[in-house]
Amino acid sequence: MIIPLAGHKYLEVVEVLDHPASDKAPFGQAVRARSAAGGGWMGWCVEVDDLAPFEERLGRAAVNGNRKFPDGRELVWKQIGILGLIADPQVPYMLKWQGDPSLHPSNAYDSSLKMSCLTIAGSASRVTEWLGEPVEKPLEDVAVEWVAPHGTPGILSVTFETANGAVTL
């Protein structure tokens, strides 16, 4: 399920598919691993204009992704970094959208819901190293609270600004 957010952002709710193909794809593996750990926030993603620096740094090519709509339209992108997310859930994976920009998930319908804060167990310096730029740059207007509890790194909570005030999940 896609939930469009303000500012060219969106939230995607995913679940494990009981299909052999989902176990072969890194994204399916990431979803299954998070589900097996009790569920919660699987990870986060950063939209980039150029995947080449990430391909070079990670030593592998980005892979194609797509989603077909019932009316035949197709959303297409390239992605890299899911394996990194599986190994270290504090780091994002990267997407480069291709094709028709009107199909971007944030455009599914108008939304005033705004993501305002991520609470991440981990290290800003580790994520900056992963991104190759200060972690604040791709997050723009989203605050990040870095905490380091004993346990697995990753997203602990997300705060959204709604018409009725802040909601933290």
Model-derived regions: residue spans:
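Short acidic (Asp/Glu) patches
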Residues: 23-33
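Charged/polar, solvent-exposed surface patches and flexible loops
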Residues: 46, 56, 129
